[in-house]
């Protein structure tokens, strides 16, 4: 791209273009929208990013993101500590929360096993999951993983690893369409899959 | 949207969702990408936005955006001061610069006349354009406006207003597809339309 907009604006466009969903063209549109709406958009977004950079951290219990550690969900005494819902990423946790079908705790794996991408168990938060599942009072681990090859491989691997802990291991029902990533599903589908979950 | 990700992250998602090209879902993905790539993406974008908010201003001559006023283009002595290219918005100016087919100066109107949206001449930078066009040494004003109803209405209005100034008034050739916004065009189309421009 020619440096037509000055180095500061080109740098801003370049960074915006790295966001998923924004290509080089839409990044330019976004930069322009920001620069035209300085007080309503540019300044607040700048503040929100600075605050997120300074304050948001990873929950040492579940792996979610929050400004407190343990996170608000892990600290919430009204939530059912006997249920742990395992998700691939924080985006899937957010989708579960929006669906409002689950009132237990979470465990963010940080990815899926993948032979193709060379992701093994050590790259995921599997050990901490087994440890949490073995704590007294934990009754059920729900594997809310995508219905993809990697998702199902990971689910079966986790079911084996959790066999030693005295917990029921379940999976989301087949309401999740094949190949479907959780965070692209509508809330109703997620709620239904949660209600109809089955043993792994 | 349920406040599933904590107020700070929800605020960030809400602001990202206001960017053109990002809906609520892609804004969540973007927020997650930012939070996962703190050092490579979140911190640099936060800095770039803060710098843009502090340093980028509107050029008092042409209406473009830059960290200096007059902007780099208006200050560039190697550019042809006898040509003024009128564009709707800064995004169109950037598109012209990327096409590399124009080495004169610009004038950013700040919009188009629109009966429907109630945009009259006073809402646009028409007076300053007429003043600039009347300065000695200005030879041609090129109306690089979109080939839409509002774009063409605006072009004809400007041609009338510029009749008193001793300048040639031209328009981009019909290489610009009907309904086409300049900043979505490929560079070759823009360059061709510039070369084949015709009297307004
Ligand atoms: Zn937590
Ligand atoms: Zn300028």
Curated annotation (Swiss-Prot), chains A, B:
Zinc finger boundaries on the chain: C4-type: 59-74
Domain of life: Bacteria
A biological process term (GO) from this entry: DNA repair
Record keywords: DNA damage, DNA recombination, DNA repair, Metal-binding, Zinc, Zinc-finger
Single GO MF descriptor: zinc ion binding
SUPFAM superfamilies per record: Recombination protein RecR
Domain Toprim: 82-177
Biological role stated in the UniProt entry: May play a role in DNA repair. It seems to be involved in an RecBC-independent recombinational process of DNA repair. It may act with RecF and RecO.
Family of the protein in this entry: Belongs to the RecR family.
The protein, known as: Recombination protein RecR
The organism of origin for this protein: Phenylobacterium zucineum (strain HLK1)
């Amino acid at each position: 791209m020619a440096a037509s907009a000055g180095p500061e604006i080109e740098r801003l466009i370049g960074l915006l273009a790295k966001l998923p969903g924004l290509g080089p063209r839409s990044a330019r549109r976004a930069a322009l929208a920001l620069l035209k709406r300085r007080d309503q958009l540019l300044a607040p977004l700048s503040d929100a990013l600075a605050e997120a950079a300074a304050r948001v951290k990873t929950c040492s219990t579940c792996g979610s993101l929050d400004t407190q550690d343990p996170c608000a969900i892990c600290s919430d005494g009204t939530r059912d500590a006997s249920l742990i819902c395992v998700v691939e990423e924080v985006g899937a946790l957010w989708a579960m929360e929006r669906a409002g079908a689950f009132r237990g705790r979470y465990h963010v794996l940080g990815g899926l096993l993948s032979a193709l991408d060379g992701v093994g168990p050590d790259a995921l938060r599997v050990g901490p999951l087994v440890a949490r599942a073995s704590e007294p009072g934990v009754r059920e681990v729900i594997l809310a993983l995508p219905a993809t090859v990697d998702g199902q491989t990971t689910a079966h691997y986790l079911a084996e690893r959790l066999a030693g802990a005295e917990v029921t291991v379940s999976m989301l029902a087949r309401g999740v369409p094949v190949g479907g990533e959780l965070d692209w599903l509508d809330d109703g589908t997620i709620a239904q899959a949660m209600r109809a979950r089955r043993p792994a």
